[in-house]
């Protein structure tokens, strides 16, 4: 489907009843072709979506609320356009369902159909809200490095290795900003780079991350671009790239890509989320 047909950036009436047809899939292959990524991906991964505004009516018409985490596998054929996801979730607001399991069943079925692959779902009831924690990404934060930069479109040539023996370390920054490719709205994120290999020059990495500041691309695609650029520039033996984007429309998106870790990290929101 063409992005010109997506709800994002258009005035769309909010639905009053459940409508799975609102979900708008976008093929991953379109963007991956520009990154020279084929069917054999150099990573595994998942896109973790957190929904904070989930509500429906029970069988007697009383509102119910919950939160949910959705796990879209990185090898699924499609991503789901975020505004269409928001509208779809809102279509449950005035929909009567016999119980929470009926909601789960519809969510799992509809999202799998849109993504082209099974989608994981963790349903968080109000009884568990008090158990939820907040934490920052692990790692050595590079934000205080004294750099000068005037490049605000992705510049992989900025990346370079530092002298020294092979290291195993985790670097992090809160300075990633990209932009929605449809509306131009800013997307803010914290980024974590975990690797084993020649030392990555930290100032160079920070400049590279900042260079996304005027770039227009979906969250998932930005993370895959970062992964590929680091692999080409520094050739680490092991690499994980993880971004946690701030929420918009009651949803946050957190793409994770790795060539050595088999399980995604715990889905713990950061302070800005």
From Swiss-Prot:
Cellular localisation:
Cytoplasm
Pathway where this protein functions: tRNA modification; tRNA-queuosine biosynthesis
Chain residues that bind NADPH: 82-83, 248-249
Output one GO MF annotation: preQ1 synthase activity
List the active site: 180 (thioimide intermediate), 187 (proton donor)
Where along this sequence does the record place binding of substrate?
80-82, 219-220
What reaction is this protein's catalytic activity?
Answer: 7-aminomethyl-7-carbaguanine + 2 NADP(+) = 7-cyano-7-deazaguanine + 2 NADPH + 3 H(+)
Q: Which GO terms describe its cellular component?
A: cytoplasm
Biological process terms in GO annotation: queuosine biosynthetic process; tRNA modification
Q: Which UniProt keywords apply?
A: Cytoplasm, NADP, Oxidoreductase, Queuosine biosynthesis
Q: Which InterPro entries match?
A: GTP-CH-I_C/QueF, NADPH_dep_7-cyano-7-deazaG_red, QueF, QueF_N, QueF_type2
EC numbers listed for it are 1.7.1.13
Q: Which family does it belong to?
A: Belongs to the GTP cyclohydrolase I family. QueF type 2 subfamily.
Q: How does it assemble?
A: Homodimer.
The UniProt function text for this chain reads: Catalyzes the NADPH-dependent reduction of 7-cyano-7-deazaguanine (preQ0) to 7-aminomethyl-7-deazaguanine (preQ1).
| Name of this chain's protein | NADPH-dependent 7-cyano-7-deazaguanine reductase
Q: Which organism is it from?
A: Bordetella pertussis (strain Tohama I / ATCC BAA-589 / NCTC 13251)
